[in-house]
């Protein structure tokens, strides 16, 4: 599972998973790959966009300290660090592919934060599913000062409207997907 990296980076990491599985004699597939993203649903896009700004709390508060406090030595194997060093770079990668340094609107633009009414959220999550084909989508649904009432309404809308619609989106086997060396990574959705 990929924990909150940008979709471009996740696409690259998924290919690492596919290649590693193949090298080890396993068949990679959606049933063994998931994606975590921030998502909030409200009755209107405007309300969700406003409440969704609270997703920036972690970046603005908890992750402000020295990097070694967030990712101390020894938390990752040397092999993991080598893989991280190969990640795509550039504007869209933002701090190793996690989007640190990108604005709220930029993170929304690349579907790292998905907010809106049920139709908007369904459309945006469908885009992520069609691109990554994850067997699991994990939703980080509240942060900062989001109110309990609004968070419970988001959960209700996800459960009653969004998730049932997503069950209609087919997952493609990974051997039907283009290899990363044939996919161009870019800054789609990012403001200059």
Regions found by a protein language model. Give the residues of each.
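An alpha-helical appendage that flanks or caps ligand/catalytic pockets
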Residues: 8-134, 167-192
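Short coil/turn segments at secondary-structure junctions
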Residues: 1, 108-112, 142, 146
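A cross-family glycoside hydrolase active-site/sugar-binding cleft signature
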Residues: 2-4, 34-36, 138-140
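Short glycine/threonine-rich loop-to-helix capping motif typified by GTGT followed
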Residues: 43-47, 146-157, 188-189
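Glycine-rich, proline-tolerant flexible connector loops at the mouths of alpha/beta enzymes
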Residues: 5, 139-151
């Amino acid at each position: 599972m990929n924990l909150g990296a940008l979709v471009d980076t996740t696409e690259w990491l998924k290919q690492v998973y596919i290649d590693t599985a193949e090298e080890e004699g396993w068949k990679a597939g959606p049933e063994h790959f998931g994606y975590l993203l921030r998502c909030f649903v409200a009755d209107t896009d405007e309300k969700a966009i406003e409440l969704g700004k609270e997703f920036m709390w972690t970046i603005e508060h908890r992750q402000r300290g020295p990097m070694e406090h967030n990712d101390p030595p020894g938390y990752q194997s040397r092999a993991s660090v080598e893989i991280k060093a190969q990640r795509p770079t550039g504007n869209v990668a933002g701090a190793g592919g996690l989007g640190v340094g990108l604005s709220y609107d930029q993170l929304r633009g690349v579907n790292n934060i998905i907010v809106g009414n049920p139709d908007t959220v369904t459309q945006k999550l469908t885009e992520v599913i069609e691109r990554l084909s994850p067997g699991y989508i994990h939703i980080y649904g509240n942060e900062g000062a989001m109110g309990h009432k609004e968070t419970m309404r988001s959960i209700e809308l996800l459960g009653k409207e969004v998730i049932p619609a997503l069950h209609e989106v087919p997952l493609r086997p990974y051997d039907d997907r283009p290899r990363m060396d044939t996919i161009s990574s870019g800054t789609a959705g990012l403001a200059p």
